[in-house]
């Protein structure tokens, strides 16, 4: 997939509208995880070096089209300022005369961050008038927000049709790494899919089916698969309406010669909190009144053997309720096994990234994808509006 590149474009003195994904966790007015900000710094540094005047736009949370101080980018700007050498200004408005004036006053290499684009309901409606007002802030558009590329919004799609548009360095890297997984993975290709719901992962499981050699399933979604095979799951999370599809996937894997593995033992709890009593149970199933909260040691051992011999690994979704220390050991063990593997490793999804960081092995992973929903949709084989809008520019 060829996307228009920034590297050879003369940007000196040009106002560049840079869409980034600064949708980071903020607690008590402080950013608690800078990963997404840091990932886009190479693009920002390239623009500074080229003498561009940079207008940065992002969303934060879901303010539902209204100005809400809780979702202001102000604390994010504070963190961002400490990561770049250039002068950084903050516009309390997104569009209009004040924002345009600030954008025109920028000197080469300086940065203006505009307020949360989702403070305007027109952003998520991809309203043409709003896209035009965003385009008035700049001469050139660059999209480096892979994490929002699956949304057809004004700042990710609409504006790209109004200005010369390019992909940022992070956007390129994401597309390159994820495309390689789908088209030419080193074998054996192992996909580790976890998380709480089958409903959110069924499409990616289906698309990966004819590409992987091993499919390792964990997290809350595993219990829908186990229930479909009449294994007792007690009070564990289950999506009844997906039992048939789960059963069909197991059958299909058998026919296709894909090694689909489910947990053979579990760490269970009598309630969904840190105070829960815990037990370890094996394949006989989970007792009534108890719920599966993590994969057990036999499952970890089974999965580790497969991970050790992999050529390529894609991991999306934790193996259990890893936010609670009592139920984190399965996810932590898998994180460490993936990090230790000699395979090319790609990890996507907020929870999996948090697990990798918690296990302190982020530096051992080949590629950490910043796009949760976007990387899943890409792995489902779907077209991403934010990427398609950039491609259109090259063919026009």
From Swiss-Prot:
Binding site for substrate: 21-23, 36, 59-62, 118, 151
Residues where ATP binds: 201, 292, 323, 349-352
Major site of localization recorded for this protein: cytoplasm
Subcellular localization, as worded in the UniProt entry: Cytoplasm
GO cellular component, one term: cytosol
A single BP term in Gene Ontology: gluconeogenesis
PROSITE patterns: PGLYCERATE_KINASE
Top-rank taxon, per record: Bacteria
Key words of the record: ATP-binding, Cytoplasm, Glycolysis, Kinase, Nucleotide-binding, Transferase
Pathway: Carbohydrate degradation; glycolysis; pyruvate from D-glyceraldehyde 3-phosphate: step 2/5
GO molecular function: ADP binding; ATP binding; phosphoglycerate kinase activity
Annotated family: Belongs to the phosphoglycerate kinase family.
Name assigned to this protein: Phosphoglycerate kinase
Organism (species): Leptospira interrogans serogroup Icterohaemorrhagiae serovar copenhageni (strain Fiocruz L1-130)
Gene that encodes the chain: pgk
